[in-house]
Amino acid sequence: ETEGSEWAKDLSSRIIAIAGMKLNEANPLVRAWTEGFSRVVIYPSRSLNSVENSSVSEEEKKAEEAKAKKINFAAMRAMDACKKRGEVILVFPAGTRYRPGRPETKRGLREIDSYLRLFDIMILVSNNGNCLRFNPEDTENMLRDLVCKDEKILCASPVIDCKTFRNDVLSKLPADDPDPKQKTVDKVMEILEAQHDEIEKIRNVHEYF
């Protein structure tokens, strides 16, 4: 917010991040860091799926589903208000950090299609390099992440018209496609991966200390 051209400072001041509920509930210290950013809290489908696949009772699962719907309905209203105020939404389409050996963490979440319908334009930003890596002994505990030296490169796509992008993807699908919304998100992830792979060719990769 203090460096760069005036337009960049203005853009930075308008960014509202989408934060999964885990960042608010997992740990008081993680929550304290999260609260340093302007954000809208959502209940990611990946989190709900983990509850549905667990051993909790059906009553608890239904209660969690109701909680998720309530949180996400409020989140969509909040994002619509952000749009009307001229703010920019920052969202990680996979809903989590990629975990090597777990390809499902690299797949975009189906609900990202809702963002494509809600907003007018988007920029896809890929992030090469990682200074904060999973601890292989405890990949679910963010407080045990490993701080590492690395070269980070951020790369942004051209501005993309959301409606045109979405319609183009849908127009190429068969009429009986079982999940067209997921296909639009898959295309987003395809572009991000290609962008990432291209930058990786010129990046100096650093290993752990």
Q: What does each of the following model-derived ranges do?
A:
Residues 85-175, 206:
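A cross-family acyltransferase "interaction/gating" segment
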Residues 1-63:
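Catalytic core of membrane glycerolipid acyltransferases/transacylases, capturing the structured
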